[in-house]
UniProtKB/Swiss-Prot annotation:
Disulfide bonds: none annotated. One of its GO terms (biological process) is electron transport chain. Coiled coil: none annotated. It comes from the Bacteria. Keywords: Electron transport, Heme, Iron, Metal-binding, Transport. InterPro entries: Cyt_c/b562, Cyt_c_II, Cyt_c_prime, Cyt_c_prime_subgr. Pfam families: Cytochrom_C_2. Cytochrome c' is the most widely occurring bacterial c-type cytochrome. Cytochromes c' are high-spin proteins and the heme has no sixth ligand. Their exact function is not known. This is Cytochrome c'. GO terms for molecular function: electron transfer activity; heme binding; iron ion binding. The keyword Nucleotide-binding does not apply.
Amino acid sequence: QFQKPGDAIEYRQSAFTLIANHFGRVAAMAQGKAPFDAKVAAENIALVSTLSKLPLTAFGPGTDKGHGTEAKPAVWSDAAGFKAAADKFAAAVDKLDAAGKTGDFAQIKAAVGETGGACKGCHDKFKEK
């Protein structure tokens, strides 16, 4: 899929940047830092849902060093733990996507909290600060 390990690292970093940007817009609404707009929330959640499937394909062999990677060695040394964290993130994003489709603020807010927790759980163990 990727010509060089550096291409994979840049790909996953770009995908995570986009996810964080679109998730952040919804999180700001959930935290009361931005006015809630169900349509805007749904649009951003749909993007998070689509984008969330991209970066995890880019943690292949040779992508553990260089190109500004912030992935900890545990991504590869604890592959089962990393997969479990990725699965938890995917499940949380699925719930977020379902909540976004309802347009209900309370459901979106709860799903944002769960998704944010899944992000943090993975970052704490598998990402350099």
